[in-house]
Amino acid sequence: MTGEGPDSADPLSEALAGLRIVDLTRLLPGPLATLRLAQWGADVLKVEDPGEGDGARTLWRTEAEAEAGEPGAFYRRLNAGKRVLRLDLRSDAGKATLLDELRGADALVEGFRPGVMARLGLGFEAVSAHNPKLVMVSISGYGQHGPWAQRAGHDINYIAMAGLLEQVASGGGEIALPNFQVGDLLGGSQAALSALLAALLAARRTGRGCHLDISMAHEVLRHQVVVRTALEALGRVPPAGCDLLSGGAPCYGVYRTADGRHLAVGALELKFWQGVCATLGRPQWERRHWSLGEAPGSEPAMALRAELQAVLATQPLAHWVQVFDTVDACVTPVLRLDEALRHPLFAG
């Protein structure tokens, strides 16, 4: 799939044709999940309140768009291919219209704070009474139940609580907030999407829908496979920047070049590391690999990392890109987004 709306070149563009989705979500997690459904051929009806509507409308909006009262690119990107209906769900008329839509729908996706749908008279029991096959997906920060259910939060809070943010730090301990919303996108969008598709298959087989409780914080924690395994094996959480995949192994890390840019070395397997060593003329490094006993984060490993950094700091990024271009060693430049969009890998 290459486009951001339904794509005729995508073999999945009609995979969900005939599926009807009602989307009450706003901002990023829910709208991205339902965007994927629309891209795969589902009929997605986005319901917004008659006032300001989805807050995403005003994010990253140009002055011209604001003056014209038009939504910005962020909203348009997340809601391409969807129909939009303005409803006041606090009014009897608005609720009646929504329930009419739900009678013929396959799924309802919502992202209100837990309890809001029930207070509106639109909880799972109420909507399933009108459509027993309906799958309802509720996306929230901390789940529909439990002591944290009513707490507000955003992506930064979900990844902080799930132990992910603590790992996104340099050796000096400074945390770098990623400009990729892991909690929203993995814990919210992708988790909701995969669970919804499974629930739709079950509903078609059994004739009964279900209510899916998607907690973004819990989903991020559930996906902490690498660090959690390290914790179980070592009895402790590896310090940030010192684990096998976070910078503790010289063969797998990010290195600064002479021009202040960075090179990503992903030579995780021994054969790739040997390719790096041969290319740099450092055969003495070949046996210094985690698979041969040099523990990630150990003093010898960090010393070798410093040696490799010193070598890569002698030349600008373009030099190393050219050097490693034909070497099978998993070495790539760290690109800015504008560079990535122009790169032949993505531009074609």
Say what each PLM segment does:
Residues 1-200, 204-205:
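N-terminal helix-loop segment corresponding to the beta1-alpha1 unit
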Residues 144, 173-182, 204-220, 236, ...:
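Conserved Rossmann-fold dehydrogenase catalytic segment
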Residues 326-348:
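A glycine-rich dinucleotide-binding beta-alpha-beta segment and adjacent secondary-structure elements
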Residues 51, 141-143, 216-221, 259-261, ...:
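Glycine-rich beta-alpha junction loops
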Residues 251-331:
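Aromatic-enriched alpha-helical interface/lid elements that frame and gate functional surfaces
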Residues 57-62, 233-240:
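Short Pro/Gly-enriched beta-strand edge/turn motifs at strand-loop
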Residues 164, 188-191, 212-221, 268:
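NAD(P)-dependent dehydrogenases' Rossmann-like dinucleotide-binding region
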Residues 162, 188-209, 226-234, 275-284:
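Oxidoreductase and adenylate-handling cofactor-binding alpha/beta cores
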